[in-house]
Amino acid sequence: MQQLNPAEISNLIKQRIQDLDAGATAKNEGTIVKVSDGIVQIHGLEDAMYGEMIEFEGEVYGMALNLERDSVGAVVLGDFLKLQEGQKAYCTGRILEVPVGPELLGRVVDALGNPIDGKGPINAKMTDKVEKIAPGVIDRQSVDQPVMTGYKSVDTMIPIGRGQRELIIGDRQTGKTAMAIDAIIAQKSSGIKCVYVAIGQKRSTIANVVRKLEQTGALEYTTVVVASASEPAALQYIAPYSGCTMGEYFRDRGEDALIVFDDLSKQAVAYRQISLLLRRPPGREAYPGDVFYLHSRLLERASRVNAAYVEKFTNGEVVGKTGSLTALPIIETQAGDVSAFVPTNVISITDGQIFLESSLFNSGIRPAVNAGISVSRVGGAAQTKIIKKLSGGIRTALAQYRELAAFAQFASDLDDVTREQLDHGERVTELMKQKQYQPMSISEQAAVIYASNEGFLADVPVEKIGSFEEAYLRYMHDEQADLMKEIDDTANYNDDIAGRLKSSLETFKQNHSY
């Protein structure tokens, strides 16, 4: 009888185990127990993480938001009508990610980064997490470089710096989106990459915005992220974070980016809807208790990071460059009520706000910026030298004008100084008006503000200020192109530039009509 060698048997078993190819990968599995309004309750999935992607049958995905003792509450990122009770759900082990990189520039994508512009697939080489921790205090650098919006009223009185969060707030139909789109168009020569996130808007409105960006050549350096009004609340909630991740790609590699959230009021409403469906306890205005955190964790990701952070992030590939992500969140108020829950939250998170007023808009002052309560908390350090030097007179003139205009209604006889201040204020108000889609360069702004400060508009009738400005800038581009280029290139202000501006104004007023 043959003797069995235990060592041989042991080796044979070990060899068989090593050669075994386990075809099925182990997945944490659960069962759908309830489906309603885009929310799924799943029994099981003990290992699910907060924010993890959950896979359902039929290639539908969800995101885990409620981790309870014996079940998981998830929002469906897509068509929840395909799902039924009793179907299986699987953990993926992955937090939600979106494609990032320069391949997304010039494209229109949904909240998950899928192209929706009919221009074919996006062959992005990288993906990144939608939810990320904002850079720490040590990794940041103070804001000291400007983002020119092309608006005289903003760049002079409420300047924005790279890495700043500047809120645009106002009622519906006051020009909030127009201001943000103009800011994107104005970045044509600045090298700043842009991301426009449309949340809860009509598709026709978004199509108009995309068309305008295309016509002005701004789409080539812009990514448009869309979560329209017809899409599930879950996608409207995620879209701003997805857009932020796309913008952070450039920030972390030593480049500058600008992101517009249009608008965060609708994101808060979508999050409220999700929270109530998940049976979370409601608070003030039925918003959940963490609605402040919803916006703070998003807007804290907009920052200016120092060269050490960029060098470490790129493993030494990019040296000596700082990166920035500037945010322009938009909030819609109801009847000018800035003391409502979401507006006060976002005002306290951001580094300043541009307040647009219906009454100014309807009286023809556009952009309808209320200079009194609009403020930029950090932008002053980022202003260019020439604009900083010249803009002091603008804010003073407007403040005095608003104060005196109230008294002038009742007083019949005004002294000469008061009348002079009223006349000057009226002209400055007229000068601050600007047409849509016509952003102005540094040199153009400097030229017209200098004219106002030095009293060259005093004898120009108020109704002719607009035509004077147009004719004067045309003259400057034709006759003083070198001066305009020098101001644009250096942004410096000295006696030589002031003298040349003065003589060009004198020549223009003598020899040209307007």
UniProtKB/Swiss-Prot annotation:
Keywords: ATP synthesis, ATP-binding, Cell inner membrane, Cell membrane, CF(1), Hydrogen ion transport, Ion transport, Membrane, Nucleotide-binding, Translocase, Transport
Major subcellular site: membrane
Species assigned in the record: Psychrobacter cryohalolentis (strain ATCC BAA-1226 / DSM 17306 / VKM B-2378 / K5)
A Gene Ontology term for the protein's cellular component: plasma membrane
Catalytic reaction equation(s): ATP + H2O + 4 H(+)(in) = ADP + phosphate + 5 H(+)(out)
Cellular localization per UniProt: Cell inner membrane
Enzyme class name: translocase
Residues annotated for ATP binding in this entry: G170, D171, R172, Q173, T174, G175, K176, T177
Protein topology in the membrane: Peripheral membrane protein
Cited InterPro entries: ATP_synth_asu-like_sf, ATP_synth_asu_C, ATP_synth_asu_C_sf, ATP_synth_F1_a_nt-bd_dom, ATP_synth_F1_asu, ATPase_a/bsu_AS, ATPase_F1/V1/A1_a/bsu_N, ATPase_F1/V1/A1_a/bsu_N_sf
Entry similarity comment: Belongs to the ATPase alpha/beta chains family.
Name of the protein this chain belongs to: ATP synthase subunit alpha
Role according to the record: Produces ATP from ADP in the presence of a proton gradient across the membrane. The alpha chain is a regulatory subunit.
Subunit details: F-type ATPases have 2 components, CF(1) - the catalytic core - and CF(0) - the membrane proton channel. CF(1) has five subunits: alpha(3), beta(3), gamma(1), delta(1), epsilon(1). CF(0) has three main subunits: a(1), b(2) and c(9-12). The alpha and beta chains form an alternating ring which encloses part of the gamma chain. CF(1) is attached to CF(0) by a central stalk formed by the gamma and epsilon chains, while a peripheral stalk is formed by the delta and b chains.
Record EC number: 7.1.2.2
One Gene Ontology molecular-function label: ATP binding
Marked site (Required for activity) residue numbers: S374
Pfam families hit by this protein: ATP-synt_ab, ATP-synt_ab_C, ATP-synt_ab_N
